[in-house]
From Swiss-Prot:
<keyword id="KW-0997">Cell inner membrane</keyword>
<comment type="similarity">
    <text>Belongs to the RodZ family.</text>
</comment>
<dbReference type="Pfam" id="PF13464">
    <property type="entry name" value="RodZ_C"/>
</dbReference>
<feature type="domain" description="HTH cro/C1-type">
    <location>
        <begin position="19"/>
        <end position="71"/>
    </location>
</feature>
<dbReference type="Pfam" id="PF13413">
    <property type="entry name" value="HTH_25"/>
</dbReference>
<dbReference type="GO" id="GO:0005886">
    <property type="term" value="C:plasma membrane"/>
</dbReference>
<keyword id="KW-0133">Cell shape</keyword>
<dbReference type="InterPro" id="IPR025194">
    <property type="entry name" value="RodZ-like_C"/>
</dbReference>
<feature type="transmembrane region" description="Helical; Signal-anchor for type II membrane protein">
    <location>
        <begin position="112"/>
        <end position="132"/>
    </location>
</feature>
<protein>
    <recommendedName>
        <fullName>Cytoskeleton protein RodZ</fullName>
    </recommendedName>
</protein>
<keyword id="KW-0238">DNA-binding</keyword>
<dbReference type="InterPro" id="IPR010982">
    <property type="entry name" value="Lambda_DNA-bd_dom_sf"/>
</dbReference>
<keyword id="KW-1003">Cell membrane</keyword>
<dbReference type="InterPro" id="IPR050400">
    <property type="entry name" value="Bact_Cytoskel_RodZ"/>
</dbReference>
<feature type="topological domain" description="Periplasmic">
    <location>
        <begin position="133"/>
        <end position="330"/>
    </location>
</feature>
<feature type="DNA-binding region" description="H-T-H motif">
    <location>
        <begin position="30"/>
        <end position="49"/>
    </location>
</feature>
<feature type="compositionally biased region" description="Low complexity">
    <location>
        <begin position="176"/>
        <end position="202"/>
    </location>
</feature>
Amino acid sequence: MNTEATQDHQEANTTGARLRHAREQLGLSQQAVAERLCLKVSTVRDIEDDKAPADLASTFLRGYIRSYARLVHIPEEELLPMMAKQAPIRAAKVAPMQSFSLGKRRKKRDGWLMSFTWLVLFVVIGLSGAWWWQDHKAQQEEISTMADQSSAELNGGDANSQNVPLDTSAPVDSGTDSAANSAPTDTASTPTTSAPAQTPADNNAVVAPSQANVDTAGTAPTTPATPASPLPTDQANVTTPAASAQDLVMNFSADCWLEVSDATGKKLFSGLQRKGGNLNLSGQAPYKLKIGAPAAVQIQFLGKPVDLSRFIRTNQVARLTLNAEQSPAQ
């Protein structure tokens, strides 16, 4: 009898036995307790049998026991000594901080490396942009200088062309009129003097038309027959030279500044050509060309077109040399 009483007392001192006894006094089943505590029936059964589930942490088990005790009106102070035996608190294992510090140092090193990479990238982009801007600015300044130079040359050429007719028109017209008026009278009165007068006319064939007319007007009183013969002689000599095999032909589809010189260094042309204009230049090959707008000009050399596409694609001033023996070179 004493042994059975001792066993009953020991069982009553366990957490599960106290909870089961209180539940039975309230007339609750394990299913009802599980529903109220939102637990599985197996979990309630393990708590009453003083079993600790392997997949349940001790912290959660102690919380379930407290909830069960409040449900069946058992003070928690009575169960604390029993819970310490059934669900002892295990010391948490603190992982060393070495891995975190290593990761932090690695992250910091990666951040510095990424910052340096971005810095190098920005420097490269900045240098590339500065180089492009300087090159573009130099090309624009060169084109502007070429345009100013061509404008100055055109203005000077216009001034010279306006002054020449004013100086030579009066004597030429007067000489021509006097020679025309005196020619019929002189030829009728002295027919024998016209033959020897052809010799000075032949000698004066290389003189410009204006100079020939002035000279004949001055010598009309002494040799009346001379004015009639130089006129057809000078007109026969003023002819357009025949096209040479070394000719350089250029047609312009837009306004373009250019400069052309031959092998002797002589500038065959330097200035601005307007849209629709054309040039036919002759000189000693090779020719050196500098073209401000390559897209606005079409060039033929030795009867073959010259390819300027490489300058048109890059939108640069074209500098090239045209040789008679080889293809055009930049």
